[in-house]
Amino acid sequence: MKELFAALLLGAVGTAWAQTTPAGLWKTIDDETKVEKSLVRITDSGGVLSGKVEKILTDKADAKCVECTDERKGQPVQGMTILRGIKPDAAEKGTWVGGDILDPNNGKIYKVLLKLVDGGKMLDVRGYVGMPMLGRTQTWLRVE
């Protein structure tokens, strides 16, 4: 009985931790059309987050980033790293900043701010130029 309780407790702690970090699999939703676009896996490497397109959910699964201007130019969007260099915001718990996000539709790179909402079930992803108030936000849904 004690072993079962300990296993349940450890499982609950793991679930609680997973909800306090953006690391995991997210379904992206287009902020204009509300269409599900892709699955993005966010990983944490030494406190720095990055995100890779794991699967494209539209009929454009073979899309390439033709407008990209860096090493991603002409590369398949599926498997591409679109989030890079993101770190926890020391001033605001539940927020990550300092990196960038690529919009593979137009090849543009924006500064990015990530914020967990609804107990970690959703992630507000704000891409911007200059200041965060000069940008737009997509809300992604946690898959795992």
Predicted regions mapped to residue ranges:
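Central antiparallel beta-sheet cores of small beta-barrel/beta-sandwich binding domains
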Residues: 28-112
